[in-house]
């Protein structure tokens, strides 16, 4: 038995080894290096000095750090809510076959396969405050133009809208798979018992979707905290995050401190704090899985 087990390991190991090596090179080693840099004053070159917790203390005393964290939290909450709601709504309309349903699914999913850089550039031109398409249309019908990406109160909302538009199709496909896995006889039995559509949704659909819903929310939360590309592209590259820091999420603040200000040690400390926040939220979600997720609906 032991000999057979060793043979299986020898058979599987060559296939797992490349992936394991890549994981170590591109994930484990960078994380370890970032944690190490967080305790130094490294600013490039070969000179560095161990500073203990100074970078972390500086971060917790920094107004920019907490503002970035607040902007990140706002972005994350809105994108999670709207992506899940819109994705679930579209899935409920499209999971049953009807004439042309595959066309509608494809149209709604296409934005997700586009490059976020291309999407960001396109919408930056569309919402350009001076000569953008949207403002041109508003002026043509006698309405006042909006600042959009140049407005402190509107810039983040535009970026949230673009994020939701590009990504809700992915969640839709995820929910369609979950809906199709629910036993249709449960709905038939519920109808016989006199249950209406709303009661069926809360008694069968939502519990049956809870494993997929839990996974979708977890992924959406992690993506929300990690956002960088839309901010970088749509607000002015390395000098972006404006206006007045209204779109400067924590990941973008980390980028600026590292690659614009060359404060690699401090940026690493911010990155470690962000990693701890994401891990903590994920652990809380996983801990609550027993309460929120139902595996009884088949």
Language-model features: where?
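A structural signal for multi-pass alpha-helical bundles of membrane permease subunits
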Residues: 4-298
């Amino acid at each position: 038995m032991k000999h057979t087990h060793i043979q299986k390991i020898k058979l599987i190991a060559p296939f797992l080894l490349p992936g394991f090596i890549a994981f170590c090179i591109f994930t484990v080693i960078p994380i370890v290096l970032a944690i190490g840099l967080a305790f130094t004053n490294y600013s490039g070159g070969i000179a560095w000095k161990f500073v203990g917790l100074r970078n972390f203390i500086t971060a917790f005393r920094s107004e920019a750090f907490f503002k970035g964290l607040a902007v990140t939290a706002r972005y994350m909450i809105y994108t999670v809510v709207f992506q899940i709601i819109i994705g679930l709504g579209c899935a409920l309309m499209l999971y049953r076959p009807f004439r042309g349903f595959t066309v509608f699914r494809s149209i709604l999913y296409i934005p997700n396969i586009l490059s976020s850089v291309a999407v960001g550039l396109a919408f930056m031109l569309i919402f350009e405050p001076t000569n953008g398409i949207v403002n041109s249309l508003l002026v043509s019908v006698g309405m006042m133009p909006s600042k959009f990406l140049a407005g402190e109160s509107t810039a983040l909302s535009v970026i949230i809208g673009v994020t939701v538009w590009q990504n809700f199709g992915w969640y839709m496909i995820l929910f369609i798979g979950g809906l199709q896995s629910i036993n249709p006889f449960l709905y038939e039995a519920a109808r016989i018992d006199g249950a209406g559509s709303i009661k069926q949704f809360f008694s069968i659909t939502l519990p049956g979707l809870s494993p997929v819903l839990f996974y979708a929310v977890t992924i959406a939360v992690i993506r929300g905290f990690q956002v960088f590309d839309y901010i970088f592209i749509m607000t002015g590259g390395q000098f972006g995050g404006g206006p007045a820091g209204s779109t400067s999420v924590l990941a973008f603040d980390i980028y600026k401190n590292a690659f614009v200000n060359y404060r690699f040690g401090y940026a690493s400390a911010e990155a470690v704090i962000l990693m701890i926040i994401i891990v903590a939220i994920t652990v809380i979600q996983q801990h609550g899985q027993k309460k929120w997720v139902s595996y009884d609906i088949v």
